[in-house]
Structures are given as structure tokens and as C-alpha cells.
Regions:
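Acidic, mature catalytic/reactive cores of soluble proteins
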Residues: 1-604
Length: 604
């Protein structure tokens, strides 16, 4: 809308194949088709002051003055109620279809919208601008009576039901009819069932999915919303899990810290499948692990890279989309991510820890359709994971860019070293679980030797803390994960002292910064939100009076979510405004982990 500054007060709809962001006035401001990392068809989110010229899909009530928006409970279906001062009111329902159809998951690349009259005699105007080439051009529209075609490399269609469709012309919406729209790939739209069936079956699907979650006694709504959001970032065709559906929303204003997160990071995915696994969803772990093993073995060397496209292929070389001004005009808008070519040694640990829910599951229990071996952890899966363990044992004391993906320097990061240790430690437990005593001894001996080196070289006796790197002086927030990795227990004096040091150096108000030292882009300005969730987990694990602190802080952090219960990557600690790519799976995983930990469930 002209004159309205873009914010992250946005709702998310999706189905795992695509996703879209909808603003408070029911305009679709971001959507890529036919998959998460494709060219955006709607991109006014990143168009700056030119958002009215960028791609978007709006359904507007003439003379609208009031807007109310919320999710239907336990679903990713958004309802927006719009009214004006004359007493006219409409209800707009937005979703992406997802349900079982002919024994398979039906999640087509389409958006579904419906407009209903609730009171008065509303006039509604539909506006659809389809972007191409990252905002450099628009698709030409070919208008038919009940459809609009948008030819191109990936042909798109808008199909309407009800009265004949005229774009940008006010339509009356009467009590006797509704306006329904299905927009997306031409073939997908042609194959779609009637709108009411799409809505009813999608609603039923998510009610069943949500009911299967093993929820804590408290924070039920927050955890359910977080779990649904994570599931929307899991690509069902391959099992890949993206970090966020957006690119280039700045971590802080005018910093240039604008990154493309529409890809699959083994690190981020570990946190996602771990959180969902704690809620009882083991299938997502199995599908993702199959994805990871497939991409590793496809290269012939079992080496992993920091990120993949949703189909398991390489991501594009980083470039800028110069036709888009950026979020609030704060470019650049990036496509691809240079961090994909970095050394990030922790990824082998995360790959192995991802399998932990499978080895905890009952032997022989079906956990997925893909041949991982499609069963809970067994000897075949264990043997395939050992290749990652060998890389971890080789790399644990080697320099890398670390989990913060520093672009200008490498060092032996403590988190990477400990994650490599965790890889060997877990392989020992997996081997024991499947009755391979010799392999259990092998991996246990490697883990013990690594633990001794890391304990000596990553502990700074003068600082009385584990440090960010071997023989280092500085801190970073990943050290809060030490008990989760089981390197030392939360009650170990070294960890307690490390938390004390982090509070002194990295805590600003309620929030934890990932680090405070200068990097390639200067000093970090906003808090990286997941670090605060790690801090809450650490306090809860330490116990005693710190547990009450953790609970109080968790409630305050939850209050920083937007009205939809969603969080971006970063937060301005003074204004509590969200920044960074949105919604971010790291943060939504953090909500689940903290709620379960505070409910007494062990960190896994």
C-alpha cells in the first residue's frame, strides 16, 4: 500500500513446496514459485518505496478502515477481516493446499484465496502484478472470463470462481456468492480440486497433524505455531529443510548484512528436526537424513558442504538483484550465498546428531517412505553415518569459518570442535544400540582423545570460560550449547563460569548477542534471537534459582513475537523490532526447545 512502510508484521502461509507472506491488509508481498528458491512472483517486500510497482496480490475493500488478522487455530490458514466506516465487511481466507490425495501428499505450488461478505454491501478490488527476473519486469496478463494467464518460462494462471474477473475494477460481493481464487503454476491450477474441497481438506490435514504433536502442558499455542512453521520449511519432495523463505532482509538497518536464506543448511536443519523430534515427529528426521545421505554420497567422497538447494544440488553463485531496492530500500538483495564454499567443520556433527531420534525410536518402527533404511536406527544407517564421523575426527582441530560464517577469517572454533567430538560420541552410542561392540569401542576411543584436546585448548583459565576458539580470548553464544552437546553437564563449574562470562560480555538487556567483536561488517548491532533461547535453555539446565530466571525470561521473549507468533532472525534490543530473514527456523526451533526444557524434558 502506498505510504505504508514495510514491516515484519506478516503472516506465513505455505505447504512445504512454496510459501508466501501476507501483510496486515491481506496483500501477498512475497512468494517464490515453483519452489522456495525460485524467482519471486510477488516481491513488494523487497521493493523499497517502489512496492506498488513490484509484484503483489491484493484483495482490497473499497474505503477500508479497519483490519483484523489471525490464523485459524492449529493451521497455517490466515483469515483477514476488513471493514469500512459504512458498515461493509469482508473476510479473506488465505492458504496453500496440503493434504493426502490418492495416498500421496498433495502440496501443489498454488495459493488459494477466498473473499466472503459478512455485512453490508462491500465492493472489492482485486489487483495482481506478477514479477519476473527479481523485479526487473512484469508478466503480461492474458485475461479470460474466469481466468488470467501469465505466460513465461514457468507459466502461471489465476483462476476465479463466481462472477467474471476484471482486474483493478471494484466487484460487489453479495451474501449469495463468494469470490474464490487459485493462483499458481498453470498445470497445478488446472489439476486443482474445487476451492471448498481445497479448504476443507487442508483444514482437516492440519488439525490431524497438530493433534499428533506431543505438546508440553504450558505454552501450547506458541509451540504449536512454531511446529507448524517449521513444517512449512520442509520440502516434501526431497526432505530438504530451508533456513527461511526470504532473502536479504537486513540483520540491522543499513548494515549490508543481507543474506539469502532460501537454502538447506545441515546446521539449521539439525535444530529443526531435533525440535520436531522432541514433539514426536520422527518422520521429518528420516526424510531429512535421507536427503543428507543422498547429497553426500552423490559426490562420491561423503564430504558435506554448508548448504544445498532444496533438490540437493549446489546453490547459485552469489549475485545481487539490482532491480530490487531492498527491504525499506536497504539493499543489496542477494541471490545465492558465498558461505556455501566455506569450510564449516561442525556440519558433520550435526549430520550425525540428526539421526539421534531414529536410534531412540523402537527398532523396526516405520519412520518414513524413503530408503534410509526407512526404519528406526539400524546397522545399515549406522554404517552410512560412519563416513561423516571419519571426517569429524579428521577436522575437529582444523580452522574453519565457524557457525557464524565469518567471511574474512578462519580459526579453530570451539563449537565446531565440540560438534565434531559429539559426532564420534554419538556414533559410539549408536553402535552400542545396534549391537556393534567393536565399533562402539572404536568411536568411544576417538571421542575420549578429542575431548581431552578440546578441554585443554578451548578452556581459558584466566577468563574462567570456554572461549570461541582454541587458545582464544573472546566469547560467542554457541558456547551455551555445551550441555546440549553433552560435552560437559550444565552443572559443571566450567560451564557455569562460561555462562557467567557470557552474561558479562554478550548480554544486552534480556538478549544475548552472538558475539561482540568486530567482523567483516563491523560490530553486530542487533541480537541474534536464537542465542537468547540457548541462554534460556542453559539457565534451565543449570537449575536452582536460575530455572525461575529462565521461565521469566522465556515469557518476556515470547512477548517479542509478532501478532502471528512468528520471529525473524534478529531483534533490536531497544525497540524490540524484528529484523533479518523471516520467519527464521532457528528461532522457531528455539521456542519449542525452551518450552520443552522448562517442562522438564531433557535436551537432546
Amino acid at each position: 500500500m502506498k505510504g505504508q512502510e514495510m514491516s515484519l508484521e506478516l503472516g506465513l502461509i505455505g505447504n512445504g513446496k512454496i510459501a508466501a507472506l501476507i501483510d496486515s491488509r491481506a496483500e501477498v508481498v512475497w512468494c517464490c514459485m515453483p519452489r522456495f528458491d525460485a524467482d519471486p512472483v510477488f516481491c513488494s517486500l523487497l521493493a523499497g518505496a517502489d512496492r506498488d510497482l513490484a509484484g503483489g496480490f491484493s484483495v482490497s475493500l473499497v474505503d477500508a478502515s479497519s483490519f483484523e488478522q489471525s490464523y485459524l487455530p492449529n493451521t497455517p490458514i490466515i483469515v483477514t477481516r476488513v471493514s469500512n466506516d459504512r458498515g461493509d465487511e469482508i473476510e479473506i481466507t488465505d492458504f496453500c493446499p496440503r493434504f493426502e490425495r490418492s495416498g500421496k501428499l498433495y502440496a501443489p505450488p498454488i495459493l488459494a484465496r477466498q473473499v466472503k461478505r459478512t455485512t453490508g454491501n462491500p465492493l472489492v478490488q482485486v489487483s495482481l502484478r506478477v514479477s519476473e527476473d527479481y523485479g526487473c519486469s512484469h508478466r503480461e496478463a492474458v485475461v479470460h472470463k474466469h481466468a488470467v494467464d501469465f505466460p513465461g518460462k514457468y507459466p502461471l494462471t489465476l483462476k476465479s470462481s463466481g462472477q467474471p474477473l476484471s482486474m483493478d475494477v471494484p466487484h460487489p460481493v453479495t451474501a449469495s456468492h463468494t469470490m474464490s481464487f487459485v493462483f499458481g503454476g498453470r498445470d497445478a491450477v488446472a489439476d486443482a480440486p474445487p476451492f471448498e474441497q481445497l479448504l476443507e481438506e487442508t483444514l482437516a490435514y492440519w488439525h490431524v497433524w497438530s493433534a499428533a504433536l506431543k505438546l508440553p502442558g504450558d505454552f501450547v499455542d506458541a509451540v504449536t505455531r512454531a511446529a507448524i512453521t517449521l513444517e512449512l520449511n520442509a520440502y516434501p519432495e526431497t526432505g530438504g529443510i530451508i533456513a527461511a523463505i526470504t532473502t536479504s532482509i537486513p540483520e540491522a538497518p543499513n548494515t549490508g548484512r543481507n543474506w539469502d536464506y532460501r537454502y538447506c543448511w545441515p546446521r539449521d536443519a539439525y535444530f529443526v528436526v531435533n525440535a520436531l523430534g522432541r514433539l514426536g515427529d520422527v518422520r521429518t528426521s528420516a526424510r531429512y537424513l535421507h536427503f543428507l545421505l543422498r547429497v553426500a554420497e552423490a559426490g562420491g567422497s561423503s564430504l558435506l558442504v554448508p548448504m544445498y538447494s532444496v533438490d540437493g544440488g549446489p546453490i547459485p553463485e552469489e549475485q545481487t538483484a539490482d532491480c530490487l531496492a531492498g527491504f525499506r530500500g536497504m539493499g543489496p538483495v542477494r541471490i545465492g550465498n558465498k558461505a556455501s564454499v566455506q569450510a564449516q567443520n561442525d556440519i558433520y556433527g550435526e549430520a550425525i546428531l540428526t539421526a539421534e531420534p531414529l536410534f531412540r525410536a523402537r527398532r523396526g518402527e516405520e519412520v518414513g517412505e524413503d530408503p534410509v533404511s526407512a526404519r528406526a536406527g539400524d546397522r545399515t544407517l549406522f554404517t552410512r553415518l560412519e563416513q561423516f564421523g571419519e571426517h569429524a575426527a579428521r577436522l575437529y582441530d582444523q580452522p574453519d569459518a565457524g557457525l557464524w560464517e565469518l567471511r574474512g577469517t578462519t580459526r579453530v572454533h570451539t563449537f565446531s570442535s565440540m560438534m565434531c567430538w559429539a559426532a564420534c560420541d554419538r556414533l559410539a552410542s549408536y553402535a552400542e544400540a545396534v549391537g556393534l561392540a567393536e565399533r562402539a569401542r572404536y568411536w568411544s576411543e576417538r571421542a575420549i582423545a578429542m575431548h581431552e584436546v578440546i578441554s585443554k585448548r578451548c578452556w581459558n583459565p584466566k577468563k574462567k570460560a570456554f572461549t570461541a576458539a582454541m587458545e582464544g580470548e573472546s566469547l560467542d553464544a554457541s558456547l551455551l550449547l555445551i550441555p546440549r552437546l553433552r560435552f560437559v553437564p550444565a552443572t559443571d563449574e566450567r560451564f557455569v563460569q562460561t555462562v557467567d562470562a557470557i552474561e558479562r560480555e554478550l548480554k544486552h538487556g534480556d538478549f544475548i548477542y552472538r558475539y561482540v567483536e568486530q567482523d567483516d561488517f563491523g560490530h553486530p548491532e542487533n541480537a541474534f534471537l536464537v542465542c537468547t533461547f540457548w541462554y534460556i535453555e542453559a539457565l534451565a539446565a543449570i537449575g536452582g534459582t536460575r530455572r525461575a530466571e529462565a521461565l521469566a525470561l522465556f515469557n518476556r521473549v515470547l512477548a517479542a513475537r509478532n501478532k502471528h507468533g512468528l520471529l525473524a532472525e534478529d531483534l533490536d534490543t531497544r525497540t524490540l523490532e524484528q529484523w533479518g530473514n523471516y520467519p527464521q527456523t532457528y528461532c522457531m526451533s528455539g521456542i519449542i526447545d525452551c518450552a520443552l526444557t522448562l517442562a522438564g524434558q531433557a535436551i537432546v
